[in-house]
Each structure stands twice: as C-alpha cells, then as structure tokens.
Amino acid sequence: MRTIADLPFIDYADPAYAAAPYEWLAEQALNHRIARSDRGVELLDYNLCRAFVLDRTMGTDHGNLVEKMGIPESRALTFKRRMLLTQNRGEVRQRLRGALTGLIGPKQAGDLREGIAGVVSNLLDALPDGVVDLKHAFADLVPAGVYCHWVDAPLSQARFVSEMSETVLAIFRRDPSLTPRIVAAYDELFAYAADRIAARKQAMGDDFLSQLIRVQQVGALSESELEDFAVMLIEASTDNTAASIAIIIDRLTAQPGVWAAIANDPTLAIPAV
C-alpha cells in the first residue's frame, strides 16, 4: 500500500518557482495529480481537488489542529468548540442551515453584486498615483470591504477586518508561537462583532447582519450563534478571495490584449478568469 511518503516531492524553495510560479506549478501538474511538499499533501489536478471537496468522508480535523496549537481556555476556544458542532452533519448543522437558507437567494445575490461594485469602485478611487502594492492596497480590502457592507460598517474599517482575518487564519500555519496573537485577535473580533450587532439593533436595515438579527429575534438562532456567525464571516473574509483577486490581476495584466478586451467588454471577465 502506498503512503504519503511514497508521493513525489515538489520543492517550493526551487528558484524556478520564485522566478515563474504559475509556469512552474503548471509543469508540476502535468507530471503529478497529487504530490507532497513541506506544506503537506498537494492536489494539483482540478477535478481531483473538486472530488476531495465534495467527498463527505473527508474532513479538516480542525479539532486536532486546535489541540496542536495549544489554544487555552478562552473566547477563541469556546468559539472553536461551537464551530466544530456545525462541521458534522447532525442536528446543529441542519438547524443552522435551515435558519440561514432564506437569507441567500436571487434578490440577495443581486443586492450583493451592487454592494461589491460599490466597494470596488471606492477602493479604486482611493488608490494613490504611481506604483502601489495592489495586494495590500486593493485585493486585501475587497473581501474585507464586502464584510463591512454586510454589517453596515464604514469602508474605513476594512483594514481592521482584513488584519484580524489574516491573524486568526494563522492557525493554519500550525505554529504554536502564534497562538497568543490568535487568541487576542478573537477577543478583538468578538468585541467588534458585539458592537456591530448592538448598532444594527438600534437601526435595523436591509444589510446581511440586520437579516441575521431578525432570524435570531424569532428564535431560530441563539445570541451566541448570532455572534459566532458575525465572527465567522470575518474569519473567512480575506484569505482565498484576496489571493485570487491578486493572482487574477497579475495574470491578466501580463496579457495586455486580454486586459484591453475586458476593458472594452466587461462580459469577457468571467470567461477570462
């Protein structure tokens, strides 16, 4: 029987990766559908990745990760314990899914598109002239800005949201020296979420947080579950989306003809991506 140790090894310290990462990864994918690296197991085939994501026998083993990181008794640990209950397919998950199903539909998707367009437009207008770190000044702030839109917070708070998201997601680095920072960040996040919830309760609107509050007020969510969702949205607000935005812009600007075509016909953006 083959083990992980038998998988081919790919080395991200290879100078060729630093010089041309996309081309290097494409070459690795031609040779291997699955490999290993210093980061762990690497899935290099799209269909294989999709199969793993959809496979109900696969799990993140987040409980083991929390234990390995040595998260102490804290708001962070309490939150993680509650979130683990939502990752199985039992009663808690089914109840929460049922409570939230009505919040995502065609109308909400349309409103979100309009909100995203506003966030992107405002962030682009705020970019300084000259050379700029687009990942830091734009890509990181798009998903964080969308979170601000969800909770009716000013866009000026997007940097805080982005930094907190990055800090709590550092748990996946599996470096216990980061644990104190992660725990402190969760304390800040729960305080922030509580402030936003209190503010929206005083002036309810059509934003996503107001809708969550209404679900809680009819008894479909507990107060702690409402806060958990507000924090969970921050947790996931930056990492993959911000990285994807930066990668897409990098690749498209490397192809000026494609970039110009999209500028002339925005409907080409989706097939280009």
Where are these regions (language model features)?
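Cytochrome P450
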Residues: 1-273
